[in-house]
């Protein structure tokens, strides 16, 4: 099954003939620390169709170039594209990279010729899972040695919080989550120092109280990795999800960064999930948020297009939104309206309004068909100065599965 890996972040590229890295999925600020910009895969398959778009030309000099390359297991792959003088985009639709669960990927950018411009970049790739219905859900977080911390299950930066409700994401479709993989950049300290990573869920069955699931793994010093490929968790549209990071037994002497990945197995083949959350969305000024959050506390942007991520051919549908605070302030009718945007100035039909005492909303009727190079984001418009709130959301990305038909030649008897 094919699924899109969306990425992009408003951080200018380094033009000083530098090498920097970013997370292939989601995106964050460019960094020379490759671990903090790597993501661990929970499923095997192929990665292909690299597209990159800049918001300004690479430069005016003949040698001004930015070269983007998928890194796999610490080595450069053949999936690469160069954006040269005067150009604003590049792609590689020729190469396909075989990837295996438990290995890590990152996106490398190398500048050469000292480009005269330092544009922002958006990018996307395609993951083609070996197993039907499977797609990737990846993140990175910061462990907390002093207290249990929480992170979104899809996340672009090494951050976490002790306030779990701030990192909830909401599942937009039915499926199963399995194959938890975790890699630390340092071991937890001295045995028995450890961190336990657990998928948590809230749904109708548990009265929407976030509860530990059986999908969990514990990493004890001196180890730096662990996984749970045994357990799985069934999810439905509207379920809330978080990842807990628990310092076990003693207070660990080290608080490492953690890469983690899950496999999402959709009930409907062709569906993958885009999951996000934000900090306070405001009360007056329209905000634009990346569909997949680079950090749970993001405030997004007040500039249309600045929080966009790059699309490929797919269909978006099933928008679910959850607020931490209802809009009602007692003065008239207040609401927040969430709309999927496809390119600057263009709203799709996918929209939901959360009003008064409501804290949830969805649009399971409308859909939006995307093309290669579309720039997508989530717009929030406020009506009548509603109460400020954190927001969580989920959206389905659908690509029709390729159907293979066996052909048996008809053999004529002579």
Where are these regions (language model features)?
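Short, cationic, amphipathic peptide segments
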Residues: 410-412
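Aromatic- and Gly/Pro-enriched, solvent-exposed loop/edge beta-strand patches characteristic
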Residues: 64-131, 193-269, 334-401
């Amino acid at each position: 099954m094919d699924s899109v890996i969306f990425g992009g972040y408003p951080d200018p590229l380094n033009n000083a003939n530098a090498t920097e890295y970013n997370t292939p999925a989601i995106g964050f600020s460019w960094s020379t620390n490759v671990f903090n910009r790597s993501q661990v895969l929970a499923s095997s398959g192929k990665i292909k169709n690299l597209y990159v778009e800049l918001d300004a030309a690479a430069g005016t000099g003949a040698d001004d170039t930015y070269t983007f390359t998928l890194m796999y297991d610490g080595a450069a792959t053949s999936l690469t594209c160069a954006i040269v003088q005067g150009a604003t985009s590049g792609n590689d639709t020729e190469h396909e990279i075989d990837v295996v669960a438990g290995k890590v990927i990152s996106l490398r950018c190398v500048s050469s010729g000292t480009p005269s411009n330092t544009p922002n970049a958006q990018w996307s790739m395609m993951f083609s899972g070996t197993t039907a219905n499977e797609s990737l859900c990846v993140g990175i977080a910061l462990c907390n040695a002093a207290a249990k911390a929480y992170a979104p299950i899809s996340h672009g930066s090494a951050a976490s919080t002790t306030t779990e409700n701030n990192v909830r994401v909401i599942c937009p479709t039915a499926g199963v989550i399995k194959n938890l993989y975790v890699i630390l950049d340092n071991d937890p300290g001295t045995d028995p120092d450890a961190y336990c990573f657990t998928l948590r869920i809230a749904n109708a069955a548990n009265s929407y109280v976030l509860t530990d699931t059986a999908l969990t793994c514990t990493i004890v010093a001196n180890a730096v990795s662990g996984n749970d490929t045994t357990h799985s968790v069934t999810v439905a549209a509207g379920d809330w999800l978080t990842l807990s990071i628990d310092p076990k037994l003693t207070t660990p002497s080290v608080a490492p960064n953690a890469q983690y990945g899950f496999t999402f197995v959709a009930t409907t083949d062709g569906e993958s999930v885009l999951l996000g959350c934000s900090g306070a969305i405001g009360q007056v000024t329209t905000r634009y948020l990346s569909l997949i959050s680079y950090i749970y506390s993001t405030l997004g942007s007040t500039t249309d297009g600045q929080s966009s991520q790059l699309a490929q051919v797919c269909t978006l549908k099933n928008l679910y939104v959850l607020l931490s605070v209802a809009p009602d302030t007692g003065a008239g009718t207040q609401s927040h309206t969430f709309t999927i945007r496809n390119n600057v100035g263009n709203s799709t039909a996918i929209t939901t309004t959360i009003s008064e005492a409501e804290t949830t909303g969805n649009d399971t009727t409308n859909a939006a068909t995307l093309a290669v190079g579309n720039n997508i984001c989530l717009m929030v418009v406020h009506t009548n100065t509603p109460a400020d709130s954190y927001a969580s959301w989920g959206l389905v990305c659908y690509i029709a599965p390729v159907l293979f038909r066996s052909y048996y030649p008809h053999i004529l008897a002579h």
